[in-house]
Amino acid sequence: MATSLFRIDLPEGHHIVGDERAGDDPCYVFLHGLGSVRAGEKSASLLDHAQHRDRGFLRFDMRGHGESSGELGQVTVSELIDDAIRVLERTGPAVVVGSSLGGLVAAHAAAARPDLCERLALLAPAFGLMPNIRRQLGQDGFLHTSDGPSFFVAPRVRDDAEALDERGLPARVRVPTLVVHGTADDTIPLQVSEWFHAGVAHASKELWVVADGDHRLNTVATEIWRRVDALTTDVKP
């Protein structure tokens, strides 16, 4: 399952680092969650899925994570969305898979550039987290995550998060969409995925509620890939 490293240089000396596998289109693109990195259990499973189908695959560390530049808590969500679009411009129309914060970023990127997203899979997407970010912070301004490091959230990041138009987002998503959420997720409530799915403006959409599924959803990854591949792309939004 060999992949090759790549780097995308950004303005002001920033950069994104990832790895990719050459293969047939559409490529699978994976966006990880907050405090995570590109090389995780789900992305490894998706890479294996891509290899068995001789399809392209790409994953990258979002800024503030892993080998990419920036510090956690210092990069705005709007910047992460712009970065994701830059990556998709590299691959062309892709099957975009986002987990948690990566799901939120993927949804915004798909809404902004539907021409670059053939299908969209959102795994426990972090809807509701950003508009209410100040409620999540401690008095010291730190965000305490369930499975990652605690970190200070810069004022510009808070302001950007609160300004995101999340309420109108579902209606702007006009691509085939799979939303997956577990009933035992103690990080992001199931209700936000139900709300998002109901508003998606494409006829080919599915909400899969995983009984006893946690926030990571690692145990059902193989079925997730099957379901996103099964989404119909030849129907009108």
Mark where each language-model region is.
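N-terminal cap/lid segment of alpha/beta-hydrolase-fold proteins
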Residues: M1-A22
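The alpha/beta-hydrolase serine catalytic core
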Residues: I16, A111, L116-P237
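Short beta-strand element of the alpha/beta-hydrolase
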Residues: D25-G33
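The serine-hydrolase catalytic nucleophile loop
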Residues: G35-L47, Q191
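Conserved alpha/beta-hydrolase
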Residues: L47-S69
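Catalytic nucleophile-loop/oxyanion-hole region of alpha/beta-hydrolase
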Residues: H65-T91
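Alpha/beta-hydrolase fold nucleophile elbow
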Residues: T91-S99
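Gly/Ala-rich beta-loop-alpha elbow adjacent to hydrolase catalytic centers
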Residues: G98-A106
